[in-house]
């Protein structure tokens, strides 16, 4: 049996990081308009950190929802200011959350009519919340449609997807052509251990929910701690359990 030593593990991580940098550099060179999607989870923060070493001024965008926990919005504000990210936030909401009222953030509010109508219809028919009964529809309105706006003027977008996160991500590739929109996954082969090692080595502050046992962060009602795979805690008790919100499975252009 071959046992990897600490230097071996560190060397492997260094190689993965360098590959990620090279891939991002190639993407920026090849495509005129590139942006980084950031959920402000651990994988996104590693991706943003790596990308900004290649291009400190690269565009950062985030899609937030009314169901994101306050800790996520607070962490977004904290990291945006700490790293001077100038993040553009897309959000289906009537007003900007107080914590996101900042000159260093651009918040694009999107119409709420469809979500309010669908929510009311669902609660009237099923006596339950839209995210419980029809989570795909909830995610479509609050996440997928805003993401379409976020990438509308991009030639390529960079994501923090990893193929060991869950059952739905094992077949992703480093570079994917999604109907004319290029998606790049530079940390695709990072393990969960790689991510936390990178965070520790680079002194990156982490979202407080990770300290409570969460391994994958989303909206508060649809995220739970624990799980064999990282995404097992997402959408528990629904047809989407451990699955995807839709932004990586649906055509965005």
Question: Model-found features: residue ranges?
Answer:
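Nucleotide-activated chemistry modules centered on ATP-dependent adenylation/adenylyltransferase
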Residues: 2-253
């Amino acid at each position: 049996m071959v046992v990897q030593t600490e230097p071996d593990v560190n060397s492997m991580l260094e190689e993965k990081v360098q590959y990620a940098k090279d891939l991002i550099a190639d993407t920026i060179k090849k495509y005129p308009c590139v942006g980084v999607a950031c959920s402000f989870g651990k994988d996104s923060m590693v991706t943003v950190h790596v990308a900004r070493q290649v291009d400190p001024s690269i565009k950062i965008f985030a899609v937030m929802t009314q169901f994101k926990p306050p800790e996520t919005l607070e962490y977004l504000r904290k990291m945006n200011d700490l790293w001077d990210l100038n993040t553009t936030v897309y959000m289906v909401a009537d007003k900007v959350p107080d914590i996101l009222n900042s000159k260093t953030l651009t918040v694009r509010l999107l119409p709420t009519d469809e979500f309010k109508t669908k929510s009311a219809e669902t609660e009237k028919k099923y006596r339950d919340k839209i995210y419980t009964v029809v989570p795909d529809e909830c995610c479509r309105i609050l996440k997928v449609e805003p993401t379409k706006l976020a990438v509308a003027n991009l030639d390529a977008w960079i994501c923090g997807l990893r193929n060991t996160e869950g059952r739905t991500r094992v077949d992703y590739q480093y570079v994917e052509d999604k109907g004319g929109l290029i998606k790049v996954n530079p940390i695709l082969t990072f393990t969960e251990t790689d991510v936390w090692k990178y965070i520790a080595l680079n002194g990156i502050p982490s979202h407080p929910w990770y300290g409570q046992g969460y391994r994958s962060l989303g909206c508060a009602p649809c995220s739970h701690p624990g799980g064999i795979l990282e995404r097992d805690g997402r959408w528990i008790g629904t047809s989407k359990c451990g699955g995807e919100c839709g932004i990586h499975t649906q055509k965005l252009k």
